[in-house]
Structures are given as structure tokens and as C-alpha cells.
A protein has these predicted regions:
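Conserved ABC ATPase signature
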Residues: 132-136, 140
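Helix-to-loop junction immediately C-terminal to a conserved catalytic motif
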Residues: 46
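A short, proline-enriched helix->beta-strand linker immediately N-terminal to the Walker B motif
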Residues: 151-155
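Catalytic Walker B motif of ABC-type/P-loop ATPase nucleotide-binding domains
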Residues: 157-160
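Conserved ABC ATPase "signature" region
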Residues: 62, 109-127
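ABC ATPase NBD coupling module
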Residues: 63-79, 109, 225-229
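Conserved ABC transporter NBD signature motif
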Residues: 54-62
Length: 252
């Protein structure tokens, strides 16, 4: 649960008084155009950007007030795929997936290898354990990144623009994988995206950020927002593609 959260840099506030709740097993989408504060909010949720005000609670525990050992335990419940999705280029896929297992578990080398194979199979990369990232397509690299993010069986999977740079068909298949992971494992997903197709395919609930007004201007599923929002910026985004529509208007 996020309550009264304000985040920024120095004295500059980027978002004010952000509040929302993510239900277990939900796909919760953080929406908004470029520069709206989506990535900054994500960093705050991951404990990487201290809030200026308010609090972030996981399972009733306030992240910023938890003692270091307990805080590490909370963060270990998270799996993260950042927008870069960077895999270690000199490591095989299995070795990439093994990194968090080697850092945070006491499994033997054989057990780690078995888990890595399982996670790669989970995302549709069975038999690809010994490939290097450079041998993969963009979509396969994103899948491998998700496999690594799922290595420790996280309660919450955070995905930052996972479809960025992918063609529409590959993006659709990645969305289908995200849905399958949620449906089969019950994993809660927090998704940052401005991809309209992904938003409508995936979102159970979400918030819409307005960087100019430094706050949330919409909350609910995309269909609820379309039906009930009176914010023109929200309606434009959900009907015309947000950033794409703004770019077209500027060119006109």
C-alpha cells in the first residue's frame, strides 16, 4: 500500500500525495506519458529512491522504517526487470539466471543449475541454457530477463517498459507470458508502461500520472477510466496512444 507518497530530487517535487493499493495476484499498471514520473515512482517502490513524504508498506511493514536486515528481507520478495533488461553479455542464459540464486541462497551448484533450467523453461526458453544474450532476439532477451527476475520466486514482479523496442507481435507474446505467469503462479505484477495495447490486455487496476500537475489524475482499470474519467489527458492517452498523439499534434 502506498499512502501520501511524494517523491522528487532535492527540493524539486515530481509527484505529490500518491496513494494506491495493489491487491495480491493483480496486474497493476502505472500509466502516463513521457516525463510523468513513472520510473521515479517505480524506483521509490523498490526502495531505490527515498520518499520526501508518505510511506510504502508491504504486508503491513513500512519499507523506509524497516531495520536493514528486515528491509533486505522485504526487497528479496521482489523480482525486477528494468527497461534496459540488461543481461550479462559474457554469461550464458543459465549463468545469468543463476546470479540471484548464487547471491541469495545456499543451494548447491547442481541445484542452482536445475532452478535456472526450470525458470528458462517457464518463460519458453527450454534448451537455450547455453546460449549467450547476443544470440537471442530482442523478445527472447526480455524473456530471459523475466526468468532471472523470477529466479527467487518473488511475490511481486516489477516490470519497467518490458515491451519497449519490440514489434507488435513480439510485444503481444510477451504480454501473454506475463498473463500466464500471473495466472499459473499467482504472482503480483506491477507494470510501468505507456504501451496502449499492453495496458488493455494486462491491467486489472492502475493509476495514471500527470507530470505537469505532479500527481495521480486517474485510478482504476483502463476500461473504468475510459467510462468514468473526466480528465481529457487520460481519455486522450487511452484512445489515441498518449505520447504518439502528442507527437502527432506537435508535428501538425
Amino acid at each position: 500500500m502506498v499512502s501520501g507518497l511524494s517523491v522528487g530530487f532535492g527540493a524539486r517535487v515530481l509527484l505529490r500525495d500518491v496513494s494506491f493499493r495493489v491487491t495480491r495476484g493483480q496486474i497493476f499498471v502505472i500509466m502516463g506519458g513521457s516525463g510523468s514520473g513513472k520510473s521515479t515512482l517505480l524506483r521509490a517502490l523498490l526502495g531505490l529512491h527515498p520518499p520526501m513524504a508518505g510511506e510504502i508498506r508491504y504486508g503491513g511493514e513500512a519499507l523506509d522504517r524497516a531495520p536493514p536486515g528486515r528491509r533486505d528481507g522485504i526487497l528479496r520478495r521482489f523480482g525486477v526487470l528494468y527497461q534496459s533488461g540488461a543481461l550479462f553479455s559474457s554469461m550464458t542464459l543459465a549463468e545469468n539466471v543463476a546470479v540471484p540464486l548464487e547471491m541469495h541462497t545456499r543451494l548447491s551448484a547442481g541445484e542452482i543449475a536445475a532452478v535456472a533450467r526450470l525458470k528458462l523453461a517457464l518463460v519458453g526458453l527450454r534448451g537455450s541454457e547455453n546460449l549467450l544474450p547476443a544470440e537471442l532476439s530482442g523478445g527472447m532477451q526480455k524473456r530471459a530477463g523475466i526468468a532471472r527476475a523470477m529466479a527467487l520466486d518473488p511475490e511481486i514482479l516489477f516490470l519497467d517498459e518490458p515491451s519497449a523496442g519490440l514489434d507488435p507481435m513480439t510485444g503481444r507474446r510477451l504480454d501473454e507470458l506475463i498473463l500466464a505467469l500471473r495466472n499459473s503462479l499467482g504472482t503480483t505484477v506491477v507494470l510501468v508502461t505507456h504501451e496502449l495495447d499492453s495496458i488493455f490486455r494486462l491491467a486489472d487496476d492502475g493509476i495514471f500520472l500527470d507530470g505537469e500537475r505532479e500527481r495521480v489524475i486517474g485510478a482504476g482499470s483502463p476500461r473504468e477510466l475510459l467510462a468514468h474519467s473526466r480528465e481529457q489527458k487520460v481519455l486522450d492517452f487511452l484512445t489515441r496512444g498518449g505520447d504518439r498523439a502528442s507527437t502527432e499534434e506537435t508535428r501538425a
